[in-house]
């Protein structure tokens, strides 16, 4: 049985990759977003500039765009609640279908955020576990 230290090491070594369709086209084709996130009394997470909150780190890469919508791949270096949603809103490109975080459009009738890849080391066996899904067709067609 692993202690909390062992599980923490497993958590730090995991890889979480998502894809999202965002509104507009980001300035950079790839970037690292580092910000602090806090949660208000209405349970909405947002980026703060005053140094409070927990550090959140997300790396994104543009996969395709039609300038109205962009398909991006997002790698999480931290795993905060609503991290991707809050950070994409903070750079002016909310996730399509995410009215809670500023989206003005809903082309798929749902939040256009999808878990793409999860990799981690099994805490008991030490074996690498890897799970991967395809990018939903609606995501690629929306940003084409």
Show where each model-derived region lies.
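Single conserved hydrophobic/aromatic residue that forms the stacking wall/gate
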Residues: 1-11
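Glycine- and acidic-residue-rich catalytic/RNA-contacting loop of pseudouridine synthases
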Residues: 9, 21-70, 86, 130, ...
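SH3/SH3-like beta-barrel fold
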Residues: 72-74
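Pseudouridine synthases involved in rRNA/tRNA modification
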Residues: 51-54, 67, 77, 85-144
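Conserved, well-folded catalytic cores of nucleic-acid-processing
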Residues: 12, 40, 91-94
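Non-cytosolic beta-sheet module surface loops
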Residues: 24, 76-78
């Amino acid at each position: 049985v692993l202690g909390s230290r062992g599980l923490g090491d497993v958590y730090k070594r995991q890889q979480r990759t998502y894809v999202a369709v965002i509104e507009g086209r980001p300035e950079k084709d790839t970037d690292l977003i580092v910000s602090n996130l806090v949660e208000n009394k209405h349970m909405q997470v947002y980026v703060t500039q005053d140094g409070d909150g927990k550090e959140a780190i997300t790396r994104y890469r543009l996969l395709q765009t039609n300038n109205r919508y962009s398909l991006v791949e997002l790698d999480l270096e931290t795993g905060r609640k609503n991290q991707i949603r809050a950070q994409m809103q903070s750079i002016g490109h909310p996730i399509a279908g995410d009215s809670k975080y500023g989206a003005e459009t809903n082309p798929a009738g749902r939040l256009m955020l999808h878990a793409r890849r999860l990799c981690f080391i099994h805490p008991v066996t030490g074996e690498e576990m890897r799970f991967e899904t395809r990018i939903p067709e609606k995501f690629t067609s929306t940003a084409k």
